[in-house]
Amino acid sequence: MTATSALTIVAASSSIALIGLAVPLLRNQAQRPGRFAKWMGVGLLCMIVLSSCSNDTTSTPTITPLVLTATATAQQGATPTATTTPANNTDWTTYHRDNQRTGYIANTPDPHNLTKAWGAQLDGAVYAEPLVVGNRVIVATEGDTLYALDPANGNVLWHTNVGTPVPQSDLPCGNIFPLGITGTPVYDPATGLVYAVAEVTGPAHILVGVDVANGQVKVRRVVDTDGMDPTAHQQRGALTLANGMIYIPYGGLDGDCSDYIGRIVASRADGQGPLLVYRVPTPREAGMWATPGASADASGNLYVSVGNGAITSGSWDHSDSILKLSPTLQLLDAFAPSSWAAENAGDVDLGSQGAVLLPNNFVFIAGKSGTGYTLRSTALGGIGGQVDAQGVCVSFGGAATVGSTIFVPCIDGVRQVNVDANGKMHLGWQASGNIFGSPVVGGHTVYSHSNDTLYALNMDSGQVIASLNVGQLNRFVTPTIAGSNIFIGTPTGITAISIV
C-alpha cells in the first residue's frame, strides 16, 4: 500500500460522548518488555556502529514538498491558546512539568543525600508520572483510581475509582495486567480538573475530569473513535492540555497483536463537542506510545513521535517519524530518517522517545536505532531533511532539558547532549549503564533511576552525588520533583524521597 496525500474528515458521532460508563486503558511506560530487553543487548552494538476512524470521507489536498496525510474529525470552536504552564513555581501539572516536556524546575535544593520519606500502597501499579498541585500529590493507578495524597506523609485526602480495569483474560496480548490508567494525567488550572484516560471493561477508553479539591468526577466521555478496536489500542503516552483541548495518544499492546493504527484523539476540556482524531496513514501499527505523549509549542502545535509501521518499501507511510500537527490535528509537517523503510522492517524506529522542543526552534529526537537528530520546528525536513544526525544512543522514554542541554534516557546510561546555535549536537558526559530512567532536573541536579535505585547526578559532570534504593520500579516510570521531595510510582503505589 502506498501513502497518498489525504485529509480525512471523520464525523465523530455525538453519541460517543453519551455512551457513559465505558472502558479504557492508559498505555504508559511499560510497553515492549521483551523488545526493550533486546535493545538493552543491542544498544552497545548500535553505538559502536554509529561512532566509526472507519467510515471516513476523503479529500486530497496537495501539500509540498512533503506528502502529508491527515485524518481529523471536524471540531467546532477550537481556538488556539498558549500552552499550559504550571500554576505556581512548585506545581508539576503535566508530564515533565510543561508542554515542552523539559522536566526542569529551577527552585529546588541540590542534595547532599536522599532518604525515603514515606511510601503509600494503593489499589494498583503506578506507571504514570505523579502530579503535584498545591498541597496534593495526584497519583493514577492501574486499578482505574485517582488519588490525592498529602505530600508530607502520604495520607489519602481523597480517592476516586472511575471504572473496572481490563483483566488479562480480556486482552489479546500486553504486559500490564490489569490495564487501568497508564498514561500520565494532566491538570488544568482554568477548570481545577485533573484529566486522565482509563481503560475499563467493555472495553472502552474513558476520559475523566476530576475536581482536584474533592475528587468529584465532572467530565466523563468515551474517547474511542470510529473504526478503532478498543481491545487492540493502548493509551500509554501522557495526555497534553493545549488550546482548551485534551490530546490523547494511542499505540498498541506489548507484542503488537491485533490490528491497531497509531492515532491521537482530542476532546474539548469540558467534554462536549465532537472528537478530533489524526490517524497515521498506514495499514497497521505506527503507534504513538512513547511515555511523554505529544509536546506542544507556544502556538499550540503538537509534536508527536511515531513508531514503526507496516510499510517496508515503496511510499512512506508516515511511520518512524516526528509529526507536527495543528491544534485541530491537521498534519502540518513531518520528518523521517532516510532509512525509514529498513527501520520499519527492523523495529528500530523513532517511536520510543518523545519529541524534545529546544530554544532557537530546534527539535531533538532519538529512538531505537541509536541515531539522534536535530530538526527545525519551522521546517522538519521531510524524509532525511535533518539539521544534524549523530550517534547518540538507543533511547526509551522522555528526555529532560535545561536550555539547549538535553539529558537523554539512553539504555546504556543517561547522556548529556548540547545543541549549539546552528543545531549541531555535541556529546557530553554519560552516566553508568545501569542509570537509564527518564530523567528530570531540579536545581543543578539530574535525577534518574535504575531498576530499583534513584540517582542524583551533577548536571555538569554526571558525577553521582547521592543514591537511594527504592525497591522495584516499573519500566519507563518518571520521577516528579516538588520542593525538597521527589515522588515516583512503584508496582504497588508510590514512594516519596526527601532531598537532604
Which residue stretches match the model-derived regions?
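Conserved P-loop NTPase nucleotide-binding/switch module
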Residues: 182
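C-terminal motif of bacterial Sec signal peptides marking the signal peptidase cleavage site
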Residues: 49-52
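Feature marks short, highly hydrophobic, charge-poor N-terminal signal-anchor/signal peptide-like helices
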Residues: 1-9
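Alpha-helical transmembrane segments
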Residues: 15-28
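Extracytoplasmic/lumenal domain signature
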Residues: 87-90, 95, 103-124, 132-138, ...
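Ser/Thr-rich, Proline-interspersed low-complexity disordered segments
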Residues: 57-87
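Membrane-interfacial entry segments at the cytosolic side of transmembrane helices
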Residues: 30-41
